[in-house]
Amino acid sequence: FAQSIIERVIEEMAKGDASKADAIRARCIDILGSSLTSVKAGSEEAEGVKQALIEADMWSQYLEVGIGPDAEVFTKAQPMSSVGWGADVGLHPVSEWNNPEPEIVLAVNSLGAVKGATLGNDVNLRDVEGRSALLLGKAKDNNASSAIGPFIRLFDDGYGIDDVRRAELELEVTGEDGFALRGQSSMSQISRDPLDL
């Protein structure tokens, strides 16, 4: 997702310091505007955007996998890093800047065929991953750092990959401390087709 890619650039440029995020976000918007939402990954246009961002000293490894020819396919981590419906999601105790990442999760068999879909929360430790992409393992490979469910909707004649492509995700978080967050994302805005991933 273009917006998610921009947020990864912000984390990287902030070196994990949340207090720098707003100023960097404003600079990104000044330079990029909404230009990433219509850019097809791996296209000549994407290469042009890359060159412009390199000149502005705004290019990032995150943008490379977001709009470059090769996607990042991250298979998450060890089995204990994912939990099911109703379980508490784990946050590494060193993280002070983190957020949920609601996503569509594809259920894929051993032959690489997509057989269904479910919901997922891929917890993002922005302060850890933002310091260095080489810390992705520390940021992602933690007990209960992702949640999936409540069930896998198997594909059949009534539900398939086109339904996934049209899906709208909504997330509402209400913290015990009064914090509230409501967000949504549309699979129609994804930078790459789910089957390409």
Language model feature labels by segment:
Residues F1-D163, A167-E172:
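Active-site microenvironments in enzyme catalytic cores
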Residues F155-L197:
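A beta-strand-loop signature enriched in Asp, Gly, Thr, and Trp
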